[in-house]
Regions:
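Rhodanese-like catalytic fold shared by cysteine-dependent sulfurtransferases
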Residues: 1-18, 26-167
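N-terminal glycine-rich beta->alpha transition that marks the start or flank
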Residues: 22
Length: 167
């Protein structure tokens, strides 16, 4: 899987019909996303449904207390069991896709002092897609994610109303 910068992502979208896919929770995508992008959530907000998820949420907040005051509207996330289904429903299976999240992660860039890379949701989503048979040749990873998307000239940021969960 090739890692590319946002400027190259835009070129591939415009000239070679690659599709930009945001893997952040839908609530984040609705607030701000690279335009145009589709949303397939790799993680979803963690809902307190029972004692197990309550314990998980409490432990997470003890480790990451800054999330209590986060503007995201949720304190923690859990893996989306329907991630692959969302990819299929969006008509993306087998298409040429560029995945991103908020910060992008790094794939083993020695010059950036990350010998083994930095794991982020977009990289985890890529791993999941490849493991499930989505051809690696049809996937690119956008380094720096949304954080650098609006730093490049002529890039657009979009927002949308949040869709009800389950749609």
């Amino acid at each position: 899987v090739e890692q590319i910068m946002p400027k190259r992502a835009k070129e591939l979208m415009q000239n070679e019909n690659w599709i930009l896919v945001d893997v952040r929770p839908q609530i984040d995508w609705c607030r701000k996303h690279a335009y145009p992008s589709k949303n397939c959530q790799y993680f979803i907000p963690l809902e307190v449904r029972d004692l197990r998820t309550f314990t998980k949420q409490a432990a997470s907040l003890a480790i990451f207390p800054e999330r209590v005051f986060s503007s995201s509207g949720y304190a923690n996330v859990e893996e989306n069991e329907n991630f692959i289904e969302e990819v299929v429903e969006e008509g993306l299976w087998g298409e040429k896709v560029i995945l991103y999240d908020d910060v992008g992660g790094v794939i083993g860039e020695e010059m950036m002092d990350f010998q083994d890379g930095v794991q982020t949701p977009s990289l985890m989503a890529i791993h999941e897609l490849v493991a499930r048979g989505f051809g690696a040749e049809n996937i690119k990873h956008m380094a720096a994610g949304l954080e650098w998307w609006d730093e490049v000239e002529d890039f657009e940021i979009g927002s949308a109303e949040q869709m009800p969960m389950g749609m």
